UniProtKB/Swiss-Prot annotation:
Protein name (record): Photosystem I reaction center subunit IV, chloroplastic
GO CC, alphabetical: chloroplast thylakoid membrane; photosystem I reaction center
Family of the protein in this entry: Belongs to the PsaE family.
Subcellular location(s) of the protein: Plastid, Chloroplast thylakoid membrane
NCBIfam families found in the cross-reference section: PRK02749.1
The organelle targeting sequence, given as a residue range: 1-24
Organism of provenance: Chlamydomonas reinhardtii
């Protein structure tokens, strides 16, 4: 006697149903408020261990990504290594008058 298989194999094509997709309107993000001094402004350095402590320099750029020392300042005079720029935190610079 031969056993019959009870499994049925039907090869059917998948049905392509039309789908209605509804997307909500994207909310435009408010522009982020810029932090720090403006580029080109003069700032006084408040970091005591800096070569340029209490001196005035010009802001080259301010990084808005949230790094620790976002303010790049360029000075007229150079330090012992011949460097004229340095990075400072927002609380280490104040606008010069």
């Amino acid at each position: 006697m031969q056993a019959l298989s009870s499994r049925v194999n039907i090869a059917a094509k998948p049905q392509r149903a039309q789908r209605l997709v509804v997307r909500a309107e994207e909310v435009k993000a408010a522009p982020k408020k810029e932090v720090g001094p403006k580029r080109g402004s003069l700032v006084k350095i408040l970091r005591p261990e800096s070569y340029w402590f209490n001196q005035v320099g010009k802001v080259v750029s301010v990084d808005q990504s949230g790094v620790r020392y976002p303010v790049v300042v360029r000075f007229e005079n150079q330090n012992y290594a011949g460097v004229t720029t340095n990075n400072y935190a927002l609380d280490e610079v104040v606008a010069a008058k």
